[in-house]
């Protein structure tokens, strides 16, 4: 009979409980592991798994609340561009749930989760020359 002690790892990667989520993700990706023990003052206090990270992503992205996800490509980057976009949305009585700025080789993209389901109103409001409206979609429409 093979026992757990015969096959267990003894040099295990860990993360501190107060570490950033991104740090845990980096360790898990670098080590190709799906579970990471969480430590506090040299004591095991829990684990974080891939599913925990997926859940956190859904929460952070605002997906769980449903609404509209807008993707903009910034065409004229300048100081205050996010403030300009936020003001346009606020003036139209639309609430921003989350904003993610993604700097890619093909440009700067801003993804905004809005607390509305009115895709046509969003399209009508976001018309500045400072950005291109790439996509407007409803989120959390499955299940």
Kindly give the residue locations of the regions a language model identified.
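A conserved regulatory-domain signal marking ACT and ACT-like small-molecule sensing domains
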Residues: 54-143
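Bateman/CBS regulatory modules and CBS-like beta-alpha motifs in cytosolic regions of diverse proteins
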Residues: 1-26, 38-39, 44-45, 65-79, ...
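Short hydrophobic beta-strand motif reused across regulatory alpha/beta modules
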Residues: 34-39, 45-53
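A broadly conserved amphipathic alpha-helix scaffold signal in soluble, globular proteins
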Residues: 25-29, 87
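Alpha-helix capping at helix-to-loop junctions
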Residues: 13, 30-34, 59
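Fold-independent oxyanion-binding glycine-rich loops
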Residues: 18, 51, 57
């Amino acid at each position: 009979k093979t026992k757990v002690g015969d096959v267990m790892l003894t040099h295990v990667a860990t993360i501190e409980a107060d570490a950033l989520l991104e740090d845990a993700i980096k360790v898990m990706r670098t080590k190709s592991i799906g579970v990471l023990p969480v430590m506090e003052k040299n004591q095991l206090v829990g684990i974080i798994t891939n599913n925990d990270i997926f859940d956190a992503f859904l929460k952070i992205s605002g997906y769980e609340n449903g609404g509209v996800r807008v993707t903009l490509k910034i065409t004229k980057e300048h100081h205050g561009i996010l403030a300009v976009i936020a003001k346009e949305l606020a003036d139209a009585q639309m609430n921003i749930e989350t904003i993610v700025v993604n700097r890619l080789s093909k440009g700067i993209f801003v993804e905004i989760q809005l607390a509305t389901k009115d895709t046509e109103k969003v399209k009508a409001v976001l018309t500045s020359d400072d950005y291109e409206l790439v996509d407007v979609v409803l989120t959390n429409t499955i299940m």
